[in-house]
Structure formats: C-alpha cells, structure tokens
Amino acid sequence: MELVLKDAQSALTVSETTFGRDFNEALVHQVVVAYAAGARQGTRAQKTRAEVTGSGKKPWRQKGTGRARSGSIKSPIWRSGGVTFAARPQDHSQKVNKKMYRGALKSILSELVRQDRLIVVEKFSVEAPKTKLLAQKLKDMALEDVLIITGELDENLFLAARNLQKVDVRDATGIDPVSLIAFDKVVMTADAVKQVEEMLA
C-alpha cells in the first residue's frame, strides 16, 4: 500500500501488515491498560497500628472513668492512629509480550490511516528552536493537537515544541500506544515511517 507525502508530489510504499491491518480493539485496550499500569509509581504506604509511633500504655483504666474503654492511642479509631488495612507499595505492572505490543501498535497506526489522522511528510523541521516558528508552521498546516514523530530527534524541533501544550515531539523509537491515540493528528516523517516498519516487522 502507499501513503501520500503531504509536502511532496509522491507516495511512500509501506507494508500493509503495519499500516493496513484490521483494528483489534480488545488487544489495543489490553496493551494501553498495561502500559498505563506500568507507569504507576506504586509507592504509596500507610502505617498500621503496629507501625505508628507512640506509647503502648493503656490511656486510662478500664473502668470507672465514665469514658469508653480504650487500650491504645494507636488504635485505628483514634485520631492519628494506625490504618486498619494499610496500603503497601506494590507493583502494578502487567505482562504484555512483544508480539501483542507490536500488534497493538500496528492496529493503532492502521486505524490512524483509515481515519485520516496520520500525516506523512518528507521532512519536518524548524530553522531555530523558537516556539513561534513551530506554532506558525502548525497553523499553516491546520494542526493544533498533534504528535510529531521524526526519524532522529531534531533538537530545534524538540525545544520549539516544549512550550506548546498540545504538541509533542518524539523520535521513532519513542512511540507508545498511549501517545499515538492521545492526539488528534500524528505527523510522521518518511524516515520515521521506515524506522517504525523495521521495528514492528
């Protein structure tokens, strides 16, 4: 199959298995959930009554005070006491093998092509690391919410995009399923397309 280059009067021949396969929604969902779960820190921690700092002495005698009986200031029902079912640091990551991950990326790329959300260009760059230059270039292309993928990371382009809220710049090795579906449009250079094809082959 062929992808039309927007900035040149030509087309790029690409593999149909990468850019023309059926959309596997269940697979994409599983991989996206696993990717997001893997990004969680999982470092939250709370203290049980055994771990809270404080005396182990009984606050007051059992009977005769008129107050409710109490055995510890570290009780979970006391203010500043321990937590009954305290959270523990945990690993939230889910296992996804390479075949599934690559299959999900191919499904997403193919769906982007079908929805006309993938724009392929010969090259994409700015003359200087200026946000204004990139903003004008995107405006001329009628792009606002966009992921730009280049063969090699262009430092000028990367620096120019840092202050644009709905614009992200990655090299071909830095793509992931979440970023591909998070933006309205994806701009890829011809070099990036070839690299992605090789990665997913």
From Swiss-Prot:
GO MF assignments: rRNA binding; structural constituent of ribosome
Keyword Signal: no
Region (Disordered): 44-71
Any Pfam family hit: Ribosomal_L4
GO cellular component: a single term: ribonucleoprotein complex
Domain of life: Bacteria
Record keywords: Ribonucleoprotein, Ribosomal protein, RNA-binding, rRNA-binding
One BP annotation, GO: translation
Transmembrane segments: none
Subunit structure: Part of the 50S ribosomal subunit.
Protein family per UniProt: Belongs to the universal ribosomal protein uL4 family.
Known role: One of the primary rRNA binding proteins, this protein initially binds near the 5'-end of the 23S rRNA. It is important during the early stages of 50S assembly. It makes multiple contacts with different domains of the 23S rRNA in the assembled 50S subunit and ribosome. Forms part of the polypeptide exit tunnel.
Name of the protein: Large ribosomal subunit protein uL4
Protein species of origin: Shigella flexneri
Gene expressing this chain: rplD
